[in-house]
């Protein structure tokens, strides 16, 4: 499978959940470089404030500190967004085995909240 160049309509707005983490912050930066608007949602539990700080002065970047386990936060984050790139999750298979309820609440129910908020908000595409 080869690389395919994808373009989006002008003034498209992206939401990157987990946007203060390694992958999420790099996605935010790449999307901004393409000239699109980016909203980042992260609770900073594993993401880094420094990743937010390096982008915060860009007028096309918005940061929301919030938790995907809260549906109201997800609804606010999805408002006016065209595309959601869901990177918010707790990693580590060993820890997920040690703390399954915690991981289920965040990774499964949090993603479900994001999907429902995206559906209700009319988001065009949801990538997870």
Say what each PLM segment does.
Residues 1-128:
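N-terminal Rossmann-like NAD(P)+-binding domain of SDR-like oxidoreductases, especially those catalyzing
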